[in-house]
């Protein structure tokens, strides 16, 4: 199952109903924790996310509201006896801060450090793009390998059924019939994660073609001057980003405490700029599924296991 669990939605200052940042993405047996701010360990308990579910931790940058929850999370993993390797991705210029946070954590986690810079793959299916903030910041893009969708009508016409469908999928051909003859391309799902940034090319690349896009929306459109001063997005700019990338679902978060606990008006500002996108103003402990790829129009279809392209990168 592919699902986003929102652990916190505040920006620099938490509120009575909004914890600091924190986002857990369950993705086919992987568990990616993004930007754990203060209190993330407790929010995980409320959300039912176990420390052992985490396989990767991804930091966009080392401002405190995006990383000060790291010691608590690592200490809980050590307490729970998590044995699998945990990969930690973060900007290389934040290495001193990250190592200090690790130093005050309980030992015992098999933690693999992956400082990064530039743009491109950092793990299989996981890429980064630079953003525009006051310190070095990166967004993340998680992609599923492209696959194909088998069409039952074409399979029937080719005389392929039952176990032969799986055999064709594995082998690529059966006699004169190829996978391409009885299926159509199915682009893999895409998840984009964009935190503190002003509008920039990297953000546009991360948003492009996403099924689920999580982006900061620190300020209202009425406070565009503050967004420009501090290099953040307004709700309307987040909507424009989703519209330019044809994102299917936009999740707004990282709200300034100046707006209180109701961020629905920010969703309205974003929705006005992205009429073709589902816009959600996130609340703490929301669970948001990654939208399934739409079935082809005009032909009955059933999904096949992904075949084909994979991203290469070090783990």
Which role fits each region the language model picked out?
Residues 1-47, 83, 140-142, 183-194, ...:
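Conserved beta-strand hairpin/beta-sheet module of binuclear metal-dependent hydrolase folds
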Residues 4, 35, 44, 61, ...:
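Divalent metal-coordination and catalytic microenvironments
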Residues 34-37, 54-62, 91, 192-197, ...:
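Active-site neighborhood of phospho(di)ester-bond hydrolases with catalytic His/Asp-centered motifs
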Residues 38-89, 113-119:
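Active-site metal-binding motif and surrounding structural segment of the metallo-beta-lactamase
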Residues 69-77, 98-101, 260-269:
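Metal-dependent catalytic neighborhoods of phosphoester/phosphodiester hydrolases
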Residues 82-86, 91-117, 258:
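Active-site neighborhood of divalent metal-dependent phosphoester bond hydrolases
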Residues 118, 201-315:
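Binuclear metal-ion centers of metallo-dependent hydrolases, dominated by the metallo-beta-lactamase
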Residues 127-206, 212-214:
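Active-site-proximal loop/helix segment associated with metal-binding centers of metalloenzymes
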């Amino acid at each position: 199952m592919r699902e986003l669990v929102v652990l916190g939605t505040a920006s620099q200052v938490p509120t009575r109903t909004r914890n600091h940042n924190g986002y857990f993405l369950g993705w086919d047996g992987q568990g990616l924790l993004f930007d754990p701010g203060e209190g993330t360990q407790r929010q995980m308990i409320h959300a039912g996310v176990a420390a052992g579910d985490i396989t990767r931790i991804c930091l966009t940058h080392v401002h405190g509201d995006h990383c000060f929850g790291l010691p608590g999370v690592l200490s809980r993993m050590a307490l729970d006896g998590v044995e699998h390797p945990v990969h930690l991705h973060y900007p290389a210029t934040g290495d001193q801060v990250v190592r200090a946070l690790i130093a005050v954590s309980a030992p015992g986690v098999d933690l693999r450090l992956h400082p990064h810079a530039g743009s491109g793959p950092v793990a299989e299916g996981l890429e980064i793009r630079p953003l525009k903030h006051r310190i070095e910041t990166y967004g993340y893009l998680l992609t599923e390998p492209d696959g194909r969708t088998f069409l039952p009508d074409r399979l029937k016409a080719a005389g392929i059924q039952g176990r032969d469908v799986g055999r064709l999928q594995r082998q690529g051909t059966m006699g004169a019939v190829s996978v391409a003859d009885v299926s159509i391309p199915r682009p893999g799902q895409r998840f984009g994660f964009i935190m503190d940034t002003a509008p920039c090319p990297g953000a546009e690349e991360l948003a492009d073609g996403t099924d689920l896009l999580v982006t900061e929306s620190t300020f209202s459109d009425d406070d565009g001057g503050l967004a420009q001063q501090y290099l953040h997005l307004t709700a309307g700019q987040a909507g424009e980003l989703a519209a330019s990338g044809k994102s299917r679902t936009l999740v707004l978060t990282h709200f300034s405490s100046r707006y209180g606990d109701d961020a629905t008006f920010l969703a309205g500002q974003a929705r006005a700029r992205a009429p073709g996108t589902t816009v959600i103003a996130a609340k703490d402990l929301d669970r948001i599924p990654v939208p399934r790829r739409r079935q082809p129009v005009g032909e009955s279809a059933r999904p096949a296991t992904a075949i084909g392209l994979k991203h290469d990168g070090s783990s």
